[in-house]
Regions:
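Alpha/beta-hydrolase fold nucleophile elbow
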Residues: 182-195
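C-terminal catalytic histidine-bearing segment of alpha/beta-hydrolase fold enzymes
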Residues: 283-325
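Short beta-strand/loop motif that positions the catalytic acidic residue
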Residues: 261, 267-269, 273
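Cap/lid segment of the alpha/beta-hydrolase catalytic domain
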Residues: 100-101, 107-169, 227-229
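N-terminal cap/lid segment of alpha/beta-hydrolase-fold proteins
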Residues: 33-77
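N-terminal targeting or regulatory segments adjacent to alpha/beta-hydrolase or S9 domains
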Residues: 1-52, 105, 133, 325
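Hydrolase active-site cap/lid region
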Residues: 198-246, 305
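Acidic catalytic loop of the alpha/beta-hydrolase fold
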Residues: 271-276, 303-304
Length: 325
C-alpha cells in the first residue's frame, strides 16, 4: 500500500491523461466573442447594512437565459478590488454573512447564482458540495458521456451539448458583466471557488487572461476527466470515435484551461476527496504556467471546508490586491 509521502511525490509530477485539443483556443475564443453581456437591472437587495452595500443584478447567458448575481461591497469607496465567488455543485449562492468576509478585507464580492440542476439529477447531486457524489458520476453527467459517441456530431458539437459547457459559459458571462460595474477596479479582479466553483474559477481565470489578477480554487472538479469515467468509455485504442470523445472532453477539462492561466494562483488539494480526485487537482496545478502559484495539500481532509486554507486565502488577497488594503 502506497504511503502518503510516496503518493504526494507522485502527484507533484502528474500531468493527467486528458490532453488539450488543438482547437481549444479557437473554440473558446468564439464562445467568448458571442458571450459579452453587461449587467442590467442593478437593484438594492432586501438586506440592510450601515457599512455595506447589498445589491443584485441580472445578465444574459449565451443561451438567452437571464441569470442573477449578488453584490456585497464596502460603502464610500469609488473603486474596489473584486472577487467573483463561484459556488459548488448542489449549493445555493452563499449567504450575505459569508460574503461579508471579503468586504471586511476591503473587497467587493460578486456571487453569481448557478443555474438549477434538472429535477432528474437534483436529488442525486444536491449534496455534491459535501463530497457525497463520486468524481465518476459527476463527470458522467456534466460531460454528457452517454451522448458523446454520436457518430454524426463533431468535437465542437459534442462539447457544446454537455451541461458543463453552459456552466463555463455562464461563469465567463458573469465575469464579463462584473468587469463593467462602476465600482470594480479592473486591474484587481480575482476568481474563487470550491469543487464545481473551483473549476469555474480556474476556467474563467484562463478565459480572462491578463484581465484576471488572481485565482483561488479548492478541490476543483473536472480536471483529468478521462481518468474519472468508467472503464471502457475511452479505450486505449486510438480510433476516430475515441479521439473525438477525448477531444470533446479536453475542450471542457479543467486541466486544459489550467494551461492558459498566467495570474497568481492559490489552490488546495484534499487527499481524501472522492468528488475531486487529487490526481485531477494536481494535474491542473502542474499544468499552470504562472510563475506565482502555490498548492496547499491536506492529507486528512476530504471535500470539506478547511480553516487553514481560508487563512491562506486572506494572505493571498492581501498580497495580490495591489496594496490597497
Amino acid at each position: 500500500m502506497r504511503g502518503v509521502s510516496s503518493y504526494r511525490d507522485f502527484l507533484k509530477t502528474y500531468h493527467g491523461r486528458t490532453l488539450c485539443p488543438d482547437v481549444f483556443d479557437e473554440f473558446w475564443a468564439d464562445v467568448c466573442e458571442e458571450n459579452k453581456p453587461k449587467a442590467r437591472e442593478v437593484r438594492k437587495a432586501s438586506v440592510n447594512c450601515s457599512r455595506l452595500t447589498c445589491e443584485e443584478f441580472t445578465y444574459l447567458a449565451s443561451d438567452g437565459v437571464s441569470l442573477k448575481a449578488h453584490i456585497l461591497r464596502p460603502r464610500g469607496v469609488a473603486l474596489l478590488p473584486t472577487v467573483i465567488l463561484y459556488t459548488d455543485c448542489g449549493r445555493e449562492v452563499r449567504g450575505w454573512l459569508h460574503l461579508a468576509r471579503f468586504a471586511s478585507l476591503g473587497f467587493a464580492v460578486v456571487a453569481p447564482e448557478i443555474r438549477s440542476l434538472p429535477q432528474a439529477v437534483r436529488t442525486s447531486f444536491e449534496k455534491a458540495w459535501k463530497g457525497e457524489v463520486s468524481a465518476g458520476n459527476l463527470t458522467a453527467y456534466y460531460f454528457n458521456t452517454n451522448a458523446l459517441d454520436r457518430a454524426e456530431d463533431s468535437v465542437v458539437e459534442c462539447a457544446r451539448r454537455a451541461p458543463l459547457f453552459q456552466l463555463i459559459s455562464d461563469a465567463y458571462a458573469a465575469a464579463h458583466a462584473t468587469q463593467f460595474l462602476p465600482f470594480v477596479d479592473k486591474g484587481c479582479l480575482m476568481t474563487w471557488g470550491e469543487g464545481l466553483g473551483g473549476a469555474l474559477a480556474l476556467d474563467t481565470a484562463a478565459l480572462l487572461g491578463l484581465q484576471c489578477a488572481g485565482v483561488m480554487a479548492q478541490n476543483p472538479f473536472f480536471a483529468d476527466s478521462e481518468a474519472c469515467v468508467t472503464d471502457g468509455f475511452c479505450s486505449a485504442q486510438e480510433t476516430p470515435k475515441n479521439v473525438r470523445i477525448a477531444d470533446a472532453m479536453g475542450l471542457l477539462d479543467t486541466a486544459s484551461f489550467a494551461e492558459r492561466i498566467t495570474c497568481p494562483t492559490l489552490m488546495a488539494c484534499s487527499l481524501e476527496d472522492r468528488s475531486s480526485l487529487p490526481e485531477g487537482t494536481c494535474a491542473a496545478y502542474n499544468r499552470i504556467p504562472a510563475e506565482q502559484k502555490r498548492m496547499a495539500v491536506y492529507p486528512r481532509h476530504a471535500h470539506e471546508r478547511i480553516n487553514d486554507f481560508e487563512n491562506l486565502q486572506i494572505n493571498f488577497l492581501l498580497t495580490y490586491s495591489g496594496g490597497r488594503l
